[in-house]
């Protein structure tokens, strides 16, 4: 049995198979949280759920008190350039660094975007996630979380050895 999800382009239905991974990373590229969605779901739909699950992160300087729950600023690509996403960030007090749709900015976002692209390539190195053998989210999400855990473990082990 095959499962298809349809989206409409003009008057013809197009079956879009596959999965998109939405990653929240720190500045070094360590994945903090990851979500998976169908390929035909728009990126901005998972913007708030991805940021709501942001774990507490202690900064480089050991300040007394609680660890931070929100970043100072957030870099995102054009898929998140919607007023709803911008309002959400303003309400939480996060500086908005989202690329504008229709405007080509070669130097600004690319300096930060490659970190996320590299992290996505680390996730896709796991064969079961890159090819997507699993049909249900119940089997995909644990594998995705395991991949993110292994990536963090390997990166932190490299830092510890230095």
Task: List the model feature ranges, each with a label.
Residues 1-101, 108, 162:
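Polybasic low-complexity intrinsically disordered regions
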Residues 18, 83, 87, 92-96, ...:
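Basic, amphipathic alpha-helical segments enriched in Lys/Arg and hydrophobic/aromatic residues
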């Amino acid at each position: 049995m095959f499962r298809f999800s349809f989206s409409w382009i003009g008057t013809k239905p197009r079956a879009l198979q596959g999965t998109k991974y939405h990653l929240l990373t720190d500045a070094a590229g360590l994945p903090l949280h990851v979500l998976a969605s169908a390929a035909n779901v728009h990126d901005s739909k998972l913007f708030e759920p991805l940021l709501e699950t942001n774990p507490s992160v202690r900064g480089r300087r050991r300040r007394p008190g609680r660890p931070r729950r929100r970043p100072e600023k957030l870099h995102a690509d054009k898929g998140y350039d919607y007023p709803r996403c911008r309002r959400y960030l303003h309400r939480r007090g996060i500086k908005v660094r989202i690329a504008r749709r229709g405007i080509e900015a070669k130097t600004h976002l690319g300096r930060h975007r490659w970190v996320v692209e590299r992290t996505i390539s680390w996730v896709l190195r796991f064969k079961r996630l890159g090819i997507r053998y699993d049909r249900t989210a119940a089997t995909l999400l644990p594998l995705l979380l395991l991949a993110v855990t292994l990536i963090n473990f390997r990166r932190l082990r490299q830092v510890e050895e230095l």
